[in-house]
Amino acid sequence: MKSGFDLLRVPWRARSFPVLLCGWLLLTGCGQAEPVKAGTTARAAHASDTLFSGPVLSFSVDIAPAQMDSLRREPRKSVPATLRSGTNVWESVGVRVKGAAGSTRSIDDLPALTLNVDKFKVGQKVYGLDKLHLNNSVQDPSRMSEIICADLYRRAGVPACRGTHALVRLNGRELGLYVLKEGFDKSFLKRNFADASGNLYDGGFLRDIDQQLELDAGKEPPDWKDLQALNAACQIPDAGLRRAQLARMVDVERFITYTALQVMTEDWDGYPCNRNNYRLYHEPSANRFIFLPHGMDQMFRHDGMPIDRGFEGIVAAQFFQDSEWRTAYFNRIESLLTNVFTTNSILPSFDATTQRLEAVLALVPKDEAEGIRASVRDLRGRIVDRTRNLQQQIAGRPRPTQLAPDGSIQLANWQSKNATGNGGSGTQRDALAGPEAIRMDLLQPGQPSLRLRLRLPAGAYRFEGRGRTKDLDSPADAKGVGLGLRISGMIRTPGLVGTSDWQPLGFEFKLEGETEVELIAEVRGQKGSGWFDTRAFRLRRK
């Protein structure tokens, strides 16, 4: 009986492989399906479940010389091959070289391979799969990043391809320990969506929804009308109308979770941050788009990627200009840090996968095995560090100002400043003018002011107050004349000059996204005095 590599031909101490696998079967309970997330409907068991929950298998790919020559000339064009795993044999399996700029290797080197099982033989499956990938993991020496990150997405409610490890041989040449991933195909869609008849797009390399993305599954030939409609929604100038249309076309909750996890795992090369490494599914029954993660072999490497950041992908950039959705994004990160992205949740799964990996490291050359173990320990440490960093970022993040139910807030805790920033000389309380009156005297040309920083969500606002002047001489000024209100970076209309009794003041402004603003109550002039009633300072959302 043979199991794994041919016991007579493999030099990696393969004679111990059956014993290791049997031990692993007892340890893990091979064949158990993935645990069902609380609050969701249990899915039916699938023929592929044992591939990802059972023992690590070996695969031998045999390609005829003529087909090898074809892959040397056209590595992305599938050729027929024979695939073996244990006593199982599959003929006419489509095989091609895969990989992006950093991971592509030639067929004669350490190639990453895509196996289209039914490419040349309709209906054929390998362990229940139509399509699978054998990744060389040249950018992830731990062979763990993709598997662990995909598990995070699935537990958070975002579909992601399952992964496991595999020992791979090509034409009798041992390639070593690979990461095996299920492919994005019809089978994947059927397992994860109620309606699997929609269009599944491959984002390709640095391509966005304004382009004709490659169709992996769906309506043939593609007309990209659904992508064009999504792009058109993102270009709507009016923020309210844009939000309404995106809410109809995008699975809002899953997109917020997807984006949060992209940042939490420091996925600098995914869709939100770089318009790369993603799939996009248009589910017809719901008529909504769902973004799916891909290419997660370089995670947790950016020493504290900030969560408060801008985004490059068209949908992400427009989506998170909306203040409510941006606030929901931060809240989702905070929520995930309590129930999914925690060391108590991640590390047991990580350690179980590590233990599963250990079952086959005995079959790998000693130096290579030790290198893998060191990389696994390093990745584990980076995950712990990232969890701590995220908690610190959430704790230290400035919170948007909370307005009262009527959309207003009384403004207090002002800081005084004069034109040269020396602590507000010429500014003082004046009890004779009122219990909370502030007086600003201009003994020489200047612009004394009161200032207050607030973080505000998108919207239209009116900054209100009350002021008076005496003998205020104020010539024309680029930012405003006399006594008045404004926010930093904006110009106000002329204010009070000369001598004036108490008058209401106001300044209106609009924010397109959540923004930190500096409110300013100022006196600009050559000489004279001005007063502000600090009890009257108020901000109202229009």
Predicted regions and their residues:
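N-terminal secretory signal peptides that target proteins for export/translocation
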Residues: 1-13
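Residue-level detector of intrinsically disordered/flexible regions characterized by low predicted structural confidence
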Residues: 4, 17, 30, 419-420
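Residues that act as N-cap/strand-start positions at coil-to-secondary-structure junctions
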Residues: 2, 75-77, 160-162, 274, ...
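Extracellular and organelle-lumenal recognition/adhesion modules and their flexible linkers in secreted
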Residues: 397-542
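Bacterial N-terminal signal peptides
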Residues: 16-28
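Phosphate/dinucleotide-binding and metal-coordinating scaffold of catalytic cores
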Residues: 30-404
